[in-house]
């Protein structure tokens, strides 16, 4: 029997920091900006750490060019994660608690603010790739969870879950990688939750349904913090005791590999399982040539000539 002190709860938050989407929000003179979203993420992270002193936190920014850890930052150490004082970092030293705040929260907030500032100031939007690298961010989160599991002591147990705060639209180009990540999370018993700010995400609906997580499209973006604390702060054990939003209808249509459109009926390659909306004699993914079975050719029957009497 594992006690509460020996049970670690790791929450990995993935924030969509697509500069194009957030730039459009700024042009609309919206009350909800990226800085307010990061503030809400900080409050959620602080609340998670306050729930139990053994709770752990990681924050990843999903950008158009990279996936970067906001917390722990570049100088984060595994010793920090599991409470080993170790040697203090020479490059980054948090200012400490000046108002009686828990020092871990102060350090986390400062690291997140510093990393997001560095990420956004160095963003280069030139080029055609303007989609959020969400599949890569989820893969990075799974790798981080796997690495943390190896550091857990023998008498401890760690439960992990991933929360995705999605802003930009889905990328059909990432469909295959996204589905691979979803099934990898399911195999490791890792929940994927989704908090969608704008249009619904069919990929995240599938991810939440397959892994047993919660999917929520925020009705009002300025109220993001309230929904984060109400729906996504409780872990999987506490959710059974709460009245949460009902599950949404999941769109399980697949995206074709030729036009990236969602289809109900299509053609599947028997070698690589790629899906196409139109028939092609050669698979464009694995270049397999299909043997087309033609209908059998029937020989024409010879007409019998009538004998003249």
From Swiss-Prot:
Source organism, top-level taxon: Eukaryota
Q: Where are the zinc fingers (C4-type)?
A: 269-286
Gene3D superfamilies (alphabetical):
von Willebrand factor, type A domain (3.40.50.410)
Give the molecular function GO annotations: zinc ion binding
InterPro entries assigned to the protein according to its UniProt record, in alphabetical order: TFIIH_Tfb4/GTF2H3 (IPR004600), vWFA_dom_sf (IPR036465)
* Subunit and interaction comment: Part of a TFIID-containing RNA polymerase II pre-initiation complex that is composed of TBP and at least GTF2A1, GTF2A2, GTF2E1, GTF2E2, GTF2F1, GTF2H2, GTF2H3, GTF2H4, GTF2H5, GTF2B, TCEA1, ERCC2, ERCC3, TAF1, TAF2, TAF3, TAF4, TAF5, TAF6, TAF7, TAF8, TAF9, TAF10, TAF11, TAF12 and TAF13. Component of the 7-subunit TFIIH core complex composed of XPB/ERCC3, XPD/ERCC2, GTF2H1, GTF2H2, GTF2H3, GTF2H4 and GTF2H5, which is active in NER.
Alphabetical list of NCBIfam families matching this protein: tfb4
Report the protein name in the record. General transcription factor IIH subunit 3
Provenance organism: Bos taurus (Bovine)
